[in-house]
């Protein structure tokens, strides 16, 4: 690949009973907070799968979140998904077409469906919403405040892909970080603002650990699509039948059902800058139906990019190998998707930094989490019935890769330990580590953590890509 083509900026969150439609929603304020994420309509918004706004899982953590008093953090790597966005180009066309078809064929729009008669589809496509930008500012502030013993004097080294919503998310993270620093009277006043240090182009022409595109067999895989089709055929026909009975003249496919459900989260995160107004699409569906929708999106990511796809985890191997290099301050060893040109240079891949921040997409985060073995306890998901998070060992798309998802890899030094300890937090849930012996707080010794990443060290099954 041509090095000059790399773009660098180096100088640079109901009245509900099962089966009962949801009641009307009013406005809420203070929906989003730096510490807890999105807290409005939790019975509903926590069931939006990968379209859920980030919400803290601290209360679901099997281990305490606080750092013990005899320990101090010496290294942090945050890996984050971009903030809330509008639908992709293809989904924009599909959603608008479903709504237009209903408006053309329906002979009546009773009750809660009245808004559809004159509804004008006006969502943007692909880009961050104002709420999504605020999510990333909040993430920057959270990062600064959580690790202020370091951030008062040290800037994170920041990488992103060159996709607009990803790169802008990194920029908003920087804004939130720097604003928090400026409000901190204990911070070094002479420390310059951080910046987006590296922006890596997306596409099959570039090696990029923050975006999949190189593994040809994976890119043509239909495993995820097949799983989605299987479960859609299980839960959506009954919904289509109910909606058709409510909207005389309308005929709906199962895909139309999924499209209408998706309008609920997408419009909610687009209407206001704190997502305090719930879209009227949300009340068209029952609590049970939202549970099914949430599971559908979990299946999509599990079979598309996680352990349910034979080539899913290997898409995250490159980033896992970069993490090991950063933890040990040793050169990267990888023959998958690492950009060797960038990773060989201290300017674009320093090994002596203390704080790192990488920004990517939901799909890539799923692959990376599996490459790290974080969900090794998750058995193959059923494609015919809903499984709870207790049945999936803590995996669900809304718990794993919501809008503005964040994973923290922390290394800490403790008085009673000669070797530093490592733990991983996904959306404030301290993860059970599967590849190394853990203590009662869910931590592994650094060398054991690295040794446990044998799948990544061996390059996974990258050879099956071609």
Curated annotation (Swiss-Prot):
PROSITE patterns to which the protein is assigned, alphabetical: HIS_ACID_PHOSPHAT_1 (PS00616), HIS_ACID_PHOSPHAT_2 (PS00778)
List of residues binding 1D-myo-inositol hexakisphosphate: 51, 81-82, 85, 88, 165, 301, 361-362
Glycosylation site residues: 120, 207, 230, 339, 352, 376
Active site: 82 (nucleophile)
pH dependence of function: Optimum pH is 5.5. Active from 2.5 to 7.5 with phytic acid as substrate. The optimum pH is shifted to more acidic values with 4-nitrophenyl phosphate as substrate.
Annotated Gene Ontology cellular component terms: extracellular region
Signal peptide: 1-19
InterPro entries the record matches: Acid_Pase_AS, His_Pase_clade-2, His_PPase_superfam, Histidine_acid_Pase_euk
EC class (word): hydrolase
Family: Belongs to the histidine acid phosphatase family.
UniProt protein name: Phytase A
Organism: Aspergillus terreus
């Amino acid at each position: 690949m041509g090095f000059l083509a790399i773009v660098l900026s180096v100088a640079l969150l109901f009245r509900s009973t099962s089966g009962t439609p949801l009641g009307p929603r009013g406005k809420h304020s203070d929906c989003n907070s730096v510490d807890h994420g999105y807290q409005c309509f939790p019975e509903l918004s926590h069931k939006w799968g990968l379209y859920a706004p980030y919400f803290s899982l601290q209360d679901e953590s099997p281990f305490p979140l606080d750092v013990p008093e005899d320990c101090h953090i010496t290294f942090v790597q945050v890996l984050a998904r971009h903030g809330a966005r509008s639908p992709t180009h293809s989904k924009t066309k599909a959603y608008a077409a479903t709504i237009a078809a209903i408006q053309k064929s329906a002979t009546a729009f009773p009750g809660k469906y009245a808004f559809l008669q004159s509804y004008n589809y006006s969502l943007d496509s692909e880009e961050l919403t104002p709420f999504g930008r605020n999510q990333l500012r909040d993430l920057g502030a959270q990062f600064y405040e959580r690790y202020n013993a370091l951030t008062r004097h040290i800037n994170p080294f920041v990488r992103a892909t060159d996709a607009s919503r990803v790169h802008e998310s990194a920029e908003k993270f920087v804004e939130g970080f720097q604003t928090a620093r400026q409000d901190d009277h204990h911070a070094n006043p002479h420390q310059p603002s951080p910046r987006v240090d590296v922006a890596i182009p997306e596409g099959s022409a570039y090696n990029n650990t923050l975006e999949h595109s190189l593994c040809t067999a994976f890119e043509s895989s239909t495993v995820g699509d097949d799983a989605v089709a299987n479960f859609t055929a299980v839960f959506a026909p009954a919904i289509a039948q109910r909606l058709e009975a409510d909207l005389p003249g309308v005929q709906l496919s199962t895909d139309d059902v999924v499209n209408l459900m998706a309008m609920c989260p997408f419009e909610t995160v687009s209407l206001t800058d704190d997502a305090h107004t719930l879209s009227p699409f949300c009340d068209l569906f029952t609590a049970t139906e939202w549970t099914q929708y949430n599971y559908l999106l979990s299946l999509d990511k599990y079979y598309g990019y996680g352990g349910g796809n034979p080539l899913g985890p290997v898409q995250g191997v490159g980033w896992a190998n970069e993490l090991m290099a950063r933890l040990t301050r040793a050169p990267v060893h990888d023959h998958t998707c690492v950009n060797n040109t960038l990773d060989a240079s201290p300017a674009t891949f320093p090994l002596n930094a203390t704080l790192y921040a990488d920004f990517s997409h939901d799909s890539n985060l799923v692959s990376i989490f599996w490459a790290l073995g974080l969900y090794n306890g998750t058995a193959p998901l059923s494609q015919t019935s809903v499984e709870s998070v207790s049945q999936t060992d803590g995996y669900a798309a809304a718990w794993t890769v919501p809008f503005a998802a964040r994973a923290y890899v922390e290394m800490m030094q403790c008085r009673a330990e000669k070797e530093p300890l490592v733990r991983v937090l996904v959306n404030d849930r301290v993860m059970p580590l599967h590849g190394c012996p853990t203590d009662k707080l869910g931590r592994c010794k650094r060398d054991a953590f690295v040794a446990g990443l044998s799948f990544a060290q061996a390059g996974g099954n990258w050879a099956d890509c071609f």
